[in-house]
Structures are given as structure tokens and as C-alpha cells.
UniProtKB/Swiss-Prot annotation:
Location of the motif Inverted processing quadruplet motif 1: 63-66
Residues with the Phenylalanine amide modification: F206
Signal sequence interval, chain numbering: 1-22
Major subcellular site: secreted
Motif (Processing quadruplet motif 3): 96-99
Protein keywords: Amidation, Antibiotic, Antimicrobial, Fungicide, Repeat, Secreted, Signal, Toxin
Posttranslational mods: Cleavage of the propeptide depends on the processing quadruplet motif (PQM) (XXXR, with at least one of X being E) and the inverted PQM (RXXX, with at least one of X being E).
Name of the molecule in the record: M-zodatoxin-Lt4a
Motif window: Processing quadruplet motif 6: 179-182
Locus of motif Inverted processing quadruplet motif 2: 91-94
Domain of life: Eukaryota
Length: 207
């Protein structure tokens, strides 16, 4: 209680001294107070602006340490890429995995050709596959050429396709001109002749 009374008395004395001093020196204490308030207001405006900038940085960067955040994001992206490569290639050594995958794919293609052409029942499979291919070619020729010039186009297209098939068989079987290949080629030629006769008969009937 005594302390509060003493503090109040000191405050009253300070105000009285300040007023008497302002009267003697010719300036108003209120002006000094206004200047201090203006300075505080300016500082408050600057503080608000700084807080806005800080908040914007936090929103954009997602945290206060933007450099670390950037590095962390890049590292995460790199790890995702590495993991994706590992998943696709099935192992860390991508070069070996690539070569192994290509070799497996080539072996699958060779095995599929063997099964179709096939060293299991190559004659029947060959005849069935060739007949289907020839019928598809005939149907395509009819649709594309409109039945106007089927004989010449049929001979040229069929001969090219037959030669491609013969060449593919030669490459897969590892020889260029064996008795089997010659016999198969003769079969292809005879089938081509039959197809030619069929086309001529069809043209004679339907024009």
C-alpha cells in the first residue's frame, strides 16, 4: 500500500515537472507524444508488412527453411525415379537387365515362330497359316481395289508376301536354300497358281 502511494506521488511529480518545463522552454509535451506514436505506428506498419512477406514465404515453400525444402523435394523425386527404374528393370543393374530382357524377348519370338511354323507340325501349321494369310490378302485386295484390277494387283502383292514369308523362314531356320525350303517354296508357288486361277474365275463370274 505504501509502495503504490509512493509510485503515484512520483508520477504526479513527474507530470508537474514536465508541464513546468514545457511552459519554460516553449514546447508542448503532446507533440513529443504524437511523434512517438507516429514512430510506433510506422514501426507497426513495417512489422505487418514483414509478417505478410514471411507468411507468403511459408505458404509458398511450405516451411521456413526453403532451401532444405527444395533439396528434400528434389531428393524425393530422384528416389521415385530410381525406384521406378528398379521396378521396371527388376534389378539395380539396368544395363544387364536390359540385355537380359531383350534376349528373353528374342527367344520368345524364336520359340513362337518354331511353335507356329513349327518343328512340331510345320507342314500342317504352315499350310493353315498360309491359307489364312492368303485369304486375308484376297479380301483386302477386294476391298481396296474395288474389284477393278484384282488379277495384276493380286499377283504382285501375293508374290511379294510369299517371298517375304520364304525369306523369314530361311532366316529363322538358319539356312538359305535347303531341300525343305525349296519344297515349301514349290508349295507356295502352286498355291499362288491356284489363287490366281480362283481370281480369274471370280473375275469372269462377277466382272
Amino acid at each position: 500500500m505504501k509502495f503504490s502511494i509512493i509510485a503515484l506521488a512520483l508520477a504526479v511529480a513527474f507530470v508537474c515537472v514536465a508541464e513546468s518545463r514545457s511552459e519554460e522552454e516553449g514546447y508542448d509535451v503532446s507533440e513529443e507524444i504524437q511523434a512517438e506514436e507516429l514512430e510506433e505506428a510506422e514501426r507497426g506498419g513495417i512489422d505487418r508488412k514483414l509478417m505478410e512477406v514471411v507468411n507468403n514465404l511459408r505458404k509458398v515453400q511450405g516451411r521456413e527453411d526453403s532451401e532444405e525444402a527444395g533439396r528434400g523435394g528434389i531428393n524425393r523425386k530422384l528416389m521415385e525415379m530410381v525406384n521406378n527404374l528398379r521396378k521396371v528393370q527388376g534389378r539395380e543393374d539396368s544395363e544387364e537387365a536390359g540385355r537380359g530382357g531383350i534376349n528373353r524377348k528374342l527367344m520368345e519370338m524364336v520359340n513362337n515362330l518354331r511353335k507356329v511354323q513349327g518343328r512340331e507340325d510345320s507342314e500342317e501349321a504352315g499350310r493353315g497359316g498360309i491359307n489364312r494369310k492368303l485369304m486375308e490378302m484376297v479380301n483386302n485386295l477386294r476391298k481396296v481395289q474395288g474389284r477393278e484390277d484384282s488379277e495384276e494387283a493380286g499377283r504382285g502383292g501375293i508374290n511379294r508376301k510369299l517371298m517375304e514369308m520364304v525369306n523369314n523362314l530361311r532366316k529363322v531356320q538358319g539356312r538359305e536354300d535347303t531341300e525343305e525350303a525349296r519344297g515349301l517354296k514349290d508349295k507356295f508357288k502352286s498355291m499362288g497358281e491356284k489363287l490366281k486361277q480362283y481370281i480369274q474365275t471370280w473375275k469372269a463370274k462377277f466382272g
